[in-house]
Amino acid sequence: LISFLWYAIYNQDNPNIYQYNEFGERMLNNFTLPQMITYLLITLVTTQLIFGSSSSFDNVSEDIKEGNIAMQLIKPINYRIRLLSNSFGSMLGTFFIIVIPISTIEIVTLGSIFGFGKLFFSFNWYNILFGFISAIISLIIYDTLDFIIAQLTFFTGASFGLYLLKASIIEFLSGSLIPLAFFPSWAQSFINFLPFAGIISIPNLILMG
């Protein structure tokens, strides 16, 4: 649905809202329609891979609410490293069980509609390699934010509201909902000082070249 929404946006009758590249293609904030569809496709995959893999928020908040945090901390294993290792294990499982099937369906569906060559205009081995490395770094950033925010359960006594607040802020500021290029320039300058862009936006742009 989001893909077709952007398709409608790029096909408005008012040509004055667009820029044009050297090939005469319509652009919004330096994104052509195929580039935007590609960004959305990659975003769906990376959000599943990153957001669906981190379990630190749930684990920490549950340990705090159930009073098990003290027992976890005195065990002869680093609590933070154990949580991060769990997230990496989940990331590996998510990649094979969810990401590969979703990617296949997306490629076949959107590629048949908009054209395979246009969607994957800049994929090459080094973009994929550095994109994979950036995805690992993204998981570390996101998992660390999960770990820090979950500790607020000490003061709130409940975690559901914290989870909704965290999810809303991160999805909005990470480029998961819309590319950060569509934000005002002053907002982009502010967001660049925050870690959120490194979760979704930067890995996506690396993959796109």
Task: Mark where each language-model region is.
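Membrane-spanning helices that line or support transport/gating and their immediate boundary helices
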Residues: 8, 56-63, 68, 144-151, ...
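Transmembrane alpha-helical segments that form the membrane-embedded catalytic/substrate-channel core
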Residues: 45-56, 136-151, 172-177
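Transmembrane alpha-helix termini and helix-breaking/packing motifs in multi-pass membrane transporters
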Residues: 3-12, 24, 100-119, 182, ...
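Transmembrane helix-boundary elements of multi-pass transport/secretion proteins
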Residues: 2-48, 52
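Alpha-helical transmembrane segments and their short interhelical loops
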Residues: 91-159, 163
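Transmembrane helix segments
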Residues: 112, 147-207
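Residue-level signature of transmembrane alpha-helical entry/exit and packing/kink sites
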Residues: 32-39, 123, 127, 131, ...
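Hydrophobic alpha-helical transmembrane segments of multi-pass membrane transport proteins
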Residues: 36-103
